[in-house]
């Protein structure tokens, strides 16, 4: 009996190009509206000199004499239990099935070359920190006819000076005076679109009371609907009262 170990497909190995990951910072205002960003991406693309062949132009590419172009070598050992055959990568051509006389001077025989390009990323409204956007084919190229890898852009939403976020809802801290809390008032609250919304504070409002402004939050990235803006008031009590306030 003959027992065979190792092996795999013969000839050139066709492998998919590597994926790339890059982080992109955006503001909360950009989350609210959606935006497009141009980023610089360094990836390995087919060498423009050899077009991925790895060989110097007009240089001979010969079939490997050790493996006859299969990219694999086979060794057979006789044992008391029978013959054992092992199949492994050809050490001469490293599994390529061919031997290049003169490697490309531009890519040093790798078939790929690093280039930096500008790519436009379309960011939908409502994304969160950690959201991954895939750009097909913008990873590393593959040699031997494989599919190019993809570029994954990981979103990082920067901290905002006024608002905090929970999902699609926004939160805002509003200081009001003791008089406003006692007598009530109508105030303006900033919103993420750069405008202001009116908020009515009823008389007798206690500190840390929250009010909801509907549809003043963020859009959802997958379906229609807008979050709310929650305004928490903090009553500022003066440490000293004027004579007029005492009266």
Predicted features, each with a name:
Residues 13-36, 98-247:
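Charged, often glycine-enriched C-terminal and inter-domain segments
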């Amino acid at each position: 009996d003959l027992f065979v170990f190792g092996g795999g497909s013969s000839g050139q190995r066709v492998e998919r190009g590597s994926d790339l990951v890059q982080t992109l910072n955006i503001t909360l205002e950009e989350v609210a509206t959606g935006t497009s960003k141009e980023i610089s991406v360094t990836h390995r693309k087919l060498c423009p000199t050899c077009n991925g062949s790895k060989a110097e132009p007009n240089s001979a590419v010969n079939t490997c004499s050790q493996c006859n172009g299969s990219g694999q070598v086979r060794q057979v050992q006789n044992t008391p239990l029978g013959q054992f055959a092992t199949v492994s990568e050809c050490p001469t051509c490293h599994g390529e099935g061919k031997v290049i006389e003169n490697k490309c001077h531009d890519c040093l025989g790798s078939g790929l070359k690093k280039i930096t390009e500008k790519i436009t990323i379309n960011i939908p409204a409502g994304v969160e920190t950690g959201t991954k956007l895939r750009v097909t084919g913008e990873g590393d190229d593959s040699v031997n006819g494989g599919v190019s890898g993809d570029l994954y852009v990981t979103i990082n939403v920067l901290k905002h000076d006024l608002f905090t976020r929970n999902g699609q809802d926004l939160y805002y801290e509003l200081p009001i005076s003791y008089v406003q809390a006692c007598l009530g008032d109508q105030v303006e609250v900033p919103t993420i679109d750069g405008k202001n919304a009116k908020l009515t504070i009823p008389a007798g409002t206690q500190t840390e009371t929250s009010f909801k402004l509907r549809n003043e939050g963020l859009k959802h990235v997958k379906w229609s609907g807008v979050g709310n803006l929650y305004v928490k008031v903090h009553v500022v009590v003066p440490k000293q009262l004027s004579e007029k306030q005492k009266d």
